[in-house]
């Protein structure tokens, strides 16, 4: 890639691709939940946690990817790189707005991720010390800002389709995804990329924190204490932190395996996750389109529909793996690269 093209290309890094693959797998499972209204409680518990990890994990990997782009861009070209990131964010917003009109039951995340990229990418020009400070501040302010917004921005609901209301939803009011809660994971992803994917004290600390953070919300819910555990609250954020930390630790530990036998097993597990991770945006668009065709109007099945579940989860994954194996770059990823001046070859080098 020429210097004029912005970010300089380089070899793909395994851990972000695998994490992105886990995230798209989690999102597929979460969006296929309505196909199994009669699922047992244990399975519902598992699927609830899978649903909870999907969006913060996507934000984490987006931060890693944005940091990779920043590091591979010459300082003189970083202004152009930021422009490319803004264009990419705007395209994600536009694609997300279009997909909300398709009539699926999915709460579309792409517009939220577009806003996240536009806001988060410039912050990655900060030094690591200042980025840690900003991350801590965003974490600390997220819950009170969300609570304040719910109490004081009621006017936004008077015109739910208006631009001011839509922006408020993206930033702070949505019951599903909010900039205030996705940005900490984005910045954390960048910091982890800077630190490196090492099995060190930081990794083991994350492993120790994960179950404790995850337990806060269910403990408060079971204790029926007068504490806010709604989406965007501190307990809810800690719950997501626990899930994301555990996922990250498992992937990094497996990626660091060096013994020949276990390495082959890990490689076999990682390959399909890496494959669908590199095509995550295309697969996201594909599965929402299939859901819109399968259940027009977003009407949930009254009984278990195993065929629908199989089409959306393993079916989408199989399409993604085969495309990656025999073609290469996902079609939406290819179009996004062309539109932002970071063109990728459609066919994967053999």
Q: Could you describe each region identified by the protein language model?
A:
Residues 1-350:
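Alpha-helical transmembrane segments and their immediate juxtamembrane cytosolic regions
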